[in-house]
A protein has these predicted regions:
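Conserved Rossmann-fold SDR core element
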Residues: 70, 97-99, 176-179, 185-202, ...
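The beta1-alpha1 cofactor-binding region of Rossmann-like NAD(H)/NADP(H)-dependent oxidoreductases
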Residues: 54, 58, 74-86, 118, ...
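Active-site helix of classical SDR
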Residues: 136, 171, 466-470
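Canonical Rossmann dinucleotide-binding motif of NAD(H)/NADP(H)-dependent dehydrogenases/reductases
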Residues: 6-39, 331-365
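C-terminal helical subdomain
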Residues: 213-216, 223-318, 495-571
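A short, exposed helix-loop element centered on a Lys and neighboring polar residues
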Residues: 136-137, 180, 433-440, 446
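Substrate-binding pocket helix/loop in short-chain dehydrogenase/reductase
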Residues: 112-113, 117-122, 408-424
Length: 571
């Protein structure tokens, strides 16, 4: 593909996926007002993606042209990699370049932590994660050749706040994780950022009404009416999609070229950078006299309060000066920990390490037999149920399933390796979801409180995104199922053989010790030298400007916040 690197000599070309309605349409129209040629990509399906939508009397492209701009529609789907690639290369052939892609495409299906069938979960993950990866794989080579380009993805507060949004929440956390990683290694002259919007879109209203219908079926008519009224008020309080147009156009333009790898929340009248997870606590695990004793001491005194406050309680008098050299005292048996734990893994080394650590805390280790761990919802439920019957009941599940690891070949640039390492991520996320949901459902049905832990290989970029999706899933489990289950997520960021024993001890603590619920929903991490606790993503500061147009001072103010944050993270 012949790319014209001198964009100043031609009209800017911007693609907006999901540009047929809602926020995508608003951004497309705002971009067109800057003089760019806009291509709106929308397959014209209903919000759940299951059927053709009623064709509008006037498309977004029609409105742009009627207003004096230049645009055309495309009915390609982001899930069709061939179609996306053909669209982008065709635009380069026609115009000489592709200057920006703003990826707003998405669908919504009724899913929650414990709701939604496998098809619904698969469809949502496919559009939001695989679809965005298709866009990136097609756009980045073009922009790399040109030496310039802007990519703006879309995540959601449901992906970084505690939310019972099911597949949508996991997908948007994966998009956030991908943005934070890819943006830092983007090709020279190319930026990758994401918008985290809130608006009364058809996707939001559909999701809220689906939740109302699911809850209302279990209530009296009056209660259902009250719920409906509350949802109407919630929707009425949200900004309209049109309010987000100028913000999206700005974030996807050269004016924002100073930023890459950042997520900006906006409601059309405010901007707030969303910080990635940051380390709150770390505890040494090498050359210690008794690792289990270190965990028993440090986690309840440091990790649990840090998770609750999202801040360390350190930086004062020494908390654990001698604990790393102390031998373990005679342990009192746990009274509220699990007694029987199902270990789900396709790696015999994990099985051995986990079972040894569990046994040291008096927890019986249960396997799934000779069969490979299931990955589909029905198969997982069947395997868990059979294991529970064979063992006479279980009250913990640990999932340390590698599956097919998406490592990098080592060839190509850093951004190419990031994309390569995300191959198969939606299948991995769906498998994790299947086991965590099945464990929670079993707890609810059996009346036995359950502890559920996921152990994720986070040594690759795709593994890090999977680990963050698992952390978001554990937050949803804590939010929805805390009455009968605690959920823990551990990202393993080392390939060293020592990881088996050290992470095994950490899992042993979470499953077998008394009262570990204070870390339910937390994001735990293990390296070769230490185990740690990370913060949840959060907005660092907010700029209020009234909207929807951005005053001239907003750019410099936002730049100051983001740059201060970046300097702080490097310090």
């Amino acid at each position: 593909v012949a790319v014209d690197s001198n964009a100043a000599d031609r009209q800017q070309v911007v693609v907006v996926t999901g540009g047929g309605a809602g926020i995508g349409a608003a951004i497309a129209e705002a971009v067109a007002r800057t003089g760019a040629y806009v291509v709106t990509v929308d397959p014209g399906v209903t919000v759940d993606g299951l059927a053709r939508d009623v064709a509008p009397a006037e498309t977004t492209a029609d409105r742009i042209v009627a207003a004096g701009g230049a645009a055309r529609p495309s009915n390609a789907s982001v899930t069709d990699a061939t179609a996306v690639d053909a669209l982008f290369t065709g635009l380069v052939d026609e115009f000489g370049g592709l200057d920006a892609v703003i990826n707003v495409a998405g669908i919504s299906r009724p899913t929650g932590f414990d709701q939604g069938d496998e098809d619904a979960w698969t469809s949502v993950l496919s559009v939001h994660v695989d679809g965005y990866l298709n866009v990136l794989r097609s756009a980045l080579p073009i922009m790399t050749a040109a030496g310039r380009g802007r990519i703006l993805g879309v995540t959601s507060g449901s992906g970084w706040r505690p939310a019972n949004a099911g597949a949508y929440s996991c997908a948007k956390r994966a998009v956030a994780a991908l943005t934070w990683q890819l943006g830092k290694v983007a090709p020279a002259g190319v930026t990758v950022n994401a918008l985290s919007p809130i608006a009364a879109t058809r996707m939001v209203t559909s999701g809220l009404r689906s939740q109302n219908q699911a809850g209302g079926s279990q209530n009296q008519a009056g209660g259902s009416q009250n719920q409906a009224g509350g949802i109407s008020l919630a929707i009425a309080a949200m900004p309209s999609p049109e309010q987000l147009g100028p913000v999206g156009a700005y974030l996807g333009s050269d004016a924002f070229s100073w930023s890459s790898g950042n997520i900006i929340f906006s409601n059309g009248s405010e901007l707030a950078p969303v910080l990635p997870p940051r380390l709150l606590e770390a505890a040494r695990i090498t050359d210690v006299a008794a690792l289990a004793h270190v965990l028993d001491t440090v986690i309840p005194a440091a990790f649990v309060p840090a998770e609750a406050a999202q801040a360390t309680n350190g930086a004062s008098n020494s908390r654990f000066a001698g604990v790393f050299d102390e031998t373990a005292p005679t342990a009192e048996p746990a009274t509220s920990g699990a007694r029987s734990c199902l270990v789900v893994t396709d790696d015999p080394r994990w099985e051995s390490a986990l079972c040894n650590a569990l046994a040291s805390r008096g927890v019986k280790c249960v396997g799934i037999g000779a069969a490979a761990p299931a990955t589909d919802f029905a198969g997982v439920s069947a395997q868990l149920g059979q294991a529970a019957r064979d063992a006479g009941g279980i009250d913990a599940v640990v999932v340390a399933r590698a599956g097919t690891r998406s490592g990098s070949s080592g060839a190509g640039e850093a951004w190419e390796q990031v994309l390569e390492e995300h191959a198969g991520i939606t299948d991995a996320i769906r498998s994790d979801v299947a086991w965590v949901r099945a464990g929670s459902a079993h707890a609810g049905a059996s009346g036995r409180r359950m502890r559920i832990a996921t152990v994720t290989d986070a040594t690759t970029s795709g593994g890090k995104s999977r680990a963050q999706a698992a952390a978001q899933l554990s937050r949803a489990a804590h939010l929805v199922a805390e009455v009968h289950a605690d959920a823990f997520a551990i990202g393993v960021e080392t390939d060293a053989d020592s990881r088996y024993s050290t992470v095994g001890e950490l899992v042993g603590y979470l499953v077998g010790a008394d009262d570990t619920g204070g870390l339910s929903g937390a994001e735990l991490v293990a390296t070769t030298e230490w185990i740690g606790l990370r913060s949840h993503p959060y907005p660092e500061a907010s700029i209020s400007f009234g909207g929807p147009e951005l005053p001239s001072w907003v750019d410099a103010t936002l730049r100051g916040i983001v740059n201060d944050s970046s300097e702080s993270s490097r310090a």
